[in-house]
Curated annotation (Swiss-Prot):
InterPro entries: Ribosomal_Su5_D2-typ_SF (IPR020568), Ribosomal_uS9 (IPR000754), Ribosomal_uS9_bac/plastid (IPR023035), Ribosomal_uS9_CS (IPR020574), Ribsml_uS5_D2-typ_fold_subgr (IPR014721). The keyword Signal does not apply. GO terms for molecular function: RNA binding; structural constituent of ribosome. The gene is rpsI. It comes from Haemophilus ducreyi (strain 35000HP / ATCC 700724). Belongs to the universal ribosomal protein uS9 family. This is Small ribosomal subunit protein uS9. GO terms for biological process: translation. Gene3D superfamilies: 3.30.230.10.
Amino acid sequence: MTAANQNYGTGRRKSSSARVFIKPGSGNITINQRSLEVYFGRETSRMVVRQPLELVELLDKLDLYITVKGGGISGQAGAIRHGITRALMEYDETLRPALRAAGFVTRDARRVERKKVGLHKARRRPQYSKR
């Protein structure tokens, strides 16, 4: 892929990291050499990936080439959405206010809370026995 007339954005969510390249085209979305429909079986994940493009009405005007690694399905979809948003802002800075208002620009900083000693999970305490 040549560097001419393409824009790049990096997205992260949980432990997933996505690299997104956008260039003018017909709306093809390729994720790790597979189509969006093949890569994400769940419609929810596909919808999350398409959200920023639908918001700025560029879904069928840009081709996306994406590599994503780490994490699970939900985290990867979120990372891709974040990466697409950043690439779109590099492509056209006037899209920033609309993307910001939709909440796509902000990196979701929530992480998995660690398990503590003496507890079952991060916050789940052992059952209390009165007697």
